[in-house]
Amino acid sequence: YYIIKDLPEDTRAAGRAAVKSFGVKSRFIHFEFFRMTENQASMGKKGQIVALEVNMRPCGGFTPDMINFARSTNVYKIWADMIAFGGTDLPVGEHFYCAFAGRRDGKHFVYSHEQIMQKYQDNMRMVDRIPDALSGAMGNQMYVANFSTREGMEQFYSDVLAVTDDTNAAAQAELAQVLALGEPDAAPAAPAAKLTAAKPARKARK
């Protein structure tokens, strides 16, 4: 998943309307919406924002840190200032796309961890192993990286998640569709320069 560079105004308006509707004050909250990809008589029209969840707590996982990276800010200090002083003067800085990618152990990836780190060393913000309790949903090895452009982020996902078996083409096509859901009006990314694939490991002799 990823944090988009600039929040669409309809999403911002929906979030603020939810805050007002629930009378929320001095809470670190997150709301979940989805955008309709086609017309549904019982739900709404294509492109419309529909509410899914209202959560009176911070978003889970690494998301608060990713918001910090994506907005060059500190949501923890903003929250503390809000509780202590009723507001904050902490500015929001430059905006980025912030991407989370998780790899599962046992898969044969086209590019090694070392190659990914070499190519994206200037983009990386967090790199770590994921605890076993969370790995079922998030993978075993995680990467969080910032990008100024959508194209750069899409190439990052393509590189990190590329596998050597015959499922790769289908997986890459599905990845492109999923990424497009975040910004439906964004044009498809142009292909970027590729890494040199890692040499396959030799099989151990029995």
Task: Give the positions of each predicted feature.
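Internal nucleotide-binding/catalytic subdomain
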Residues: 1-45
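A short beta-strand motif that forms the metal-chelation/ATP-contact edge
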Residues: 41-58
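Peripheral (often C-terminal) accessory segments that flank ATP-dependent C-N-forming ligase machineries
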Residues: 80-206
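Active-site "cap" helix and flanking loop/linker of ATP-utilizing ligase/carboxylase catalytic domains
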Residues: 12-31, 55-106
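Intrinsically disordered, low-complexity acidic/polar segments
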Residues: 40-42, 61-63, 110, 152-154
